[in-house]
Regions:
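Primarily auto-inhibitory N-terminal propeptides
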Residues: 20-190, 217
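C-terminal motif of bacterial Sec signal peptides marking the signal peptidase cleavage site
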Residues: 16-17
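Generic structural signal for small/hydrophobic residues in well-ordered secondary structure
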Residues: 56, 100, 125, 146-149, ...
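C-terminal subdomain of the subtilisin-like protease fold in secreted/lumenal serine endopeptidases
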Residues: 342-351, 359, 389-390, 491-548
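Extracellular S/T/G-rich loop segment that most often corresponds to the catalytic His/Ser-adjacent loop
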Residues: 258, 405-491, 547
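Active-site neighborhood of phospho(di)ester-bond hydrolases with catalytic His/Asp-centered motifs
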Residues: 348-350, 392-397, 416
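Active-site core segment of subtilase-fold serine proteases
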Residues: 166-327, 331-369, 383-388, 451-467, ...
Length: 548
């Protein structure tokens, strides 16, 4: 938000660099799956895929029969189980298919653009979990009316999901002088926003190892017209430090039982939840970093949480992890499409496919075509007056690997690496090819401050021993800092009447940084034997809210 002139030549060069496939020259690692040879239509492998279900993309010529059959089923109030195409239905009969439905439901006012993007051609079919997925895929791929078959690959949060409840008495001082005008009592412990080298956080803490948000808050702290979709676990929309900044759907849909008030649980196909066995508060923690309510006299601050006057950015909960239900390609793609059709301009994604499965952009496009098409659909939507597309931000991953995970590593998306209060990379962060920018993700072990060197944000009391706040670590925690900074940038642009192309704004975001490489010489830290291996591989630098 700092009013400075960007060098257009430099920006265009950077953008060009970011537009190339960041992984094309990377050989497969020993633990990576090789690029698979399939029958041509089968996109990926059944490794780590959901049982009893397959995703297929029909050719356009098959759609009239499918849609007529769907209409006939609707008239009798029965579930669609057959396509109306003999060659396909022979296989569906043999598989004893119990459900056949569009991946992306009929979209009302957005149906025309849905069909223009080809998303209406994706269907998911369900059958007994005992069926052999590979054999079923081979049979379906042999039918002329089917153009692609995709297994439902599972997704993983970019965090160990361990939470450390915040306890004011254990932390000692809960209020201190920090360079900010907000009265949130625990802002002092959010070193990732304002790092004054407090020794209680870590004896190696470095002043300025933060996102430089205090000065940015003097210019803007958010705007309700900017909607950030939290694609994650469910966000606790009743949390006292989040409720005022939750997005409210002006037109809940019958497709979602008129219960999609703040978003939807795509994993369980029901209302948003957060207190089930298996939930960790991951989505609520991420949401708090983006936009916990500022200056409300309680708890913590969010990067774009406003000034306590109802002026924070809005948080939409697009839930893809629910209790013991693990997200997968189907669930995430539906969530992404929902966000695009309901006004989100930033997609906050602290998750990904298990590291090493994809090592190039081409592999991602070829082997996860439905995921790719849904994300590209989001990127094409103009849901914010200040931006001509949707901004997609992913965590780079936590495998300590010299490449970004996917989808984060894809050239059109932003992949976020993680650093700690010592201004050095976190020991778990991925780095190298495909990684774009760094942000605070913390380290809850290995530094002198223990969990206090993690990221402090909102939690669900139901899953964290009654605590509404706590620490977590991971590129999952770094990612929402960049989403929050981007949301601040769009908020400021709206206030100033500025308009940017998606490419222009991404370039601004990736050049509004502080360098880290000068700190990555020969040497070590408590959790990393040689920090020099990260030099030139953490992205363009550390995100800086004031510079944007």
């Amino acid at each position: 938000m700092h009013n400075k002139t960007k060098l257009l030549i430099f920006a265009s060069l950077l953008l060009a660099a970011c537009s190339t496939d960041p992984m094309q020259e990377i050989p497969n690692r020993g633990d990576s799956a090789p690029e698979i040879e399939t029958s041509g239509k089968i996109c990926n492998t059944s490794d780590d895929a959901v049982a009893g279900s397959l995703i297929v993309k029909f050719g356009e010529e098959a759609i009239p029969s499918l849609e007529q059959n769907a209409l006939n089923a609707a008239k009798t109030r029965s579930a669609l189980t057959r396509s109306g195409i003999e060659s396909v239905d022979d296989i569906l009969n043999d598989l004893h298919v119990t459900s056949l439905e569009r991946v992306f439901p009929e979209a009302g006012e957005h149906e025309a653009r849905t069909r223009a993007a080809g998303l209406h051609r994706w269907y998911v079919l369900g059958f007994a979990s005992e069926e052999d997925l590979d054999k079923a895929a081979e049979r379906l791929a042999g039918v002329a009316e089917i153009s692609k078959v995709q297994f439902r690959t599972r997704l993983y949060r970019a965090s160990d999901c361990k939470t450390y409840p915040f306890q004011a008495t254990a932390n000692g001082q809960t209020r201190a002088l920090v360079t900010a005008d907000f009265n949130d009592p625990n802002l002092f412990w959010q070193w990732h926003y304002i790092n004054n080298a407090d020794q209680a956080v870590a004896t190696t803490s470095v002043a300025g190892a933060d996102i430089n948000v205090a000065d940015a808050w003097k210019l803007t702290a958010g705007n309700p017209e900017v909607i950030v979709a939290i694609v994650d676990e469910g966000v606790k929309y009743t949390h006292p430090d989040l409720a005022a900044n939750m997005w409210i759907n002006p037109n809940p849909s019958p497709e979602y039982k008129n219960q999609d008030i703040h978003g939807w649980n795509f994993a369980a196909d029901g209302p948003i939840s957060w207190g089930q066995k298996g939930d960790s508060g991951h989505g609520t923690h991420v949401a708090g970093t983006v936009a916990a309510v500022n200056n409300n006299g309680i708890g913590v601050c969010g990067v774009a949480g406003g000034t306590g006057k109802g002026d924070g950015v809005r948080l939409m909960s697009c839930q893809i992890f629910s209790g013991d239900l693990t997200g997968d390609a189907l669930v995430s793609s539906r969530a992404v499409k929902y966000a695009a059709d309901h006004g989100a301009s930033i997609l906050q994604c602290s998750w990904g496919i298990k590291a090493g499965i994809y090592t190039s952009d081409n592999m991602f496009i070829k082997q996860s075509p439905m995921d790719y098409e849904a994300l590209q659909y989001f990127a094409a939507q103009k849901n914010c007056e200040a931006l001509d597309g949707g901004l997609i931000i992913f965590s780079a991953g936590n495998e300590s690997t010299a490449m970004s995970g996917y989808p984060a590593g894809y050239r059109d998306y932003i992949s976020v690496t993680s650093f700690s209060p010592d201004y050095l990379p976190a020991n778990y962060t991925n780095y190298g090819s495909g990684c774009n920018i760094a942000a605070p993700g913390g380290e809850t072990s290995g530094l002198s401050g223990g969990e206090k060197a993690g990221v402090l944000s909102t939690l669900c009391s139901e899953t964290s021993n009654g605590a509404d706040y706590g620490y977590m670590q991971g590129t999952s925690m770094a990612c929402p800092h960049v989403s929050g900074v981007a949301a601040l940038g769009l908020s400021y642009a709206l206030e100033k009447g500025k308009r940017y192309s998606l490419d222009e704004f991404k370039t601004m975001l990736l050049t509004s940084v502080n360098e880290i490489d000068s700190r990555l010489g020969e040497g070590s830290k408590a959790t990393i034997a040689d920090v020099s291996i990260y030099r030139g591989k953490m992205g363009t630098g550390i995100t800086d809210a004031y510079q944007l």
